Amino acid sequence: MSIRERLLATVSKYIAAYNEFDPSAMKTVRTPTCLTHGVAPTCKFTQSMEEHTRHMMLSRGVFRSVNASIVDDNITVVDEVSRQVVVKVKIRCETTVGPYENEAMFIMAMNEEGALVDEIFQFLDTARFRQFQGRLEEAQ
């Protein structure tokens, strides 16, 4: 398997684990030192693997199902040298306050073998995310 194929296979495994919305599934595709970064100006954060796991556990009370998919393989960017992949993702969720949909760009940096995600940068559509947060606040 070429490095490009390995990187794309890792992205597919990550998306599948993301859809399970289970911290143990996410741990199978990430290095123990993997960092998650929210990079939108109004939604900046950095989470260690432990922090990301805690966040997922808390969020499971809100999200009943998660379905993320790559929007268009033709705009996926693979940098074999730096072991990075950029994908545009559509996210559809069923939540305690009804449906939630968003789009995001994921920049995923893999380990040397290309088999595990070592760092991920997420850029969400913050307007949609803020609307969803407002619905959650109204429901409380």
Curated annotation (Swiss-Prot):
InterPro entries: Fungal_Meroterpenoid_Isomerase. It comes from the Eukaryota. Pathway: Secondary metabolite biosynthesis; terpenoid biosynthesis. GO terms for biological process: terpenoid biosynthetic process. Belongs to the trt14 isomerase family. In A.calidoustus, the austinoid gene cluster lies on a contiguous DNA region, while clusters from E.nidulans and P.brasilianum are split in their respective genomes. Genetic rearrangements provoked variability among the clusters and E.nidulans produces the least number of austionoid derivatives with the end products austinol and dehydroaustinol, while P.brasilianum can produce until acetoxydehydroaustin, and A.calidoustus produces the highest number of identified derivatives. Part of the gene cluster B that mediates the biosynthesis of austinol and dehydroaustinol, two fungal meroterpenoids. The first step of the pathway is the synthesis of 3,5-dimethylorsellinic acid by the polyketide synthase ausA. 3,5-dimethylorsellinic acid is then prenylated by the polyprenyl transferase ausN. Further epoxidation by the FAD-dependent monooxygenase ausM and cyclization by the probable terpene cyclase ausL lead to the formation of protoaustinoid A. Homodimer. This is Austinoid biosynthesis clusters protein S.
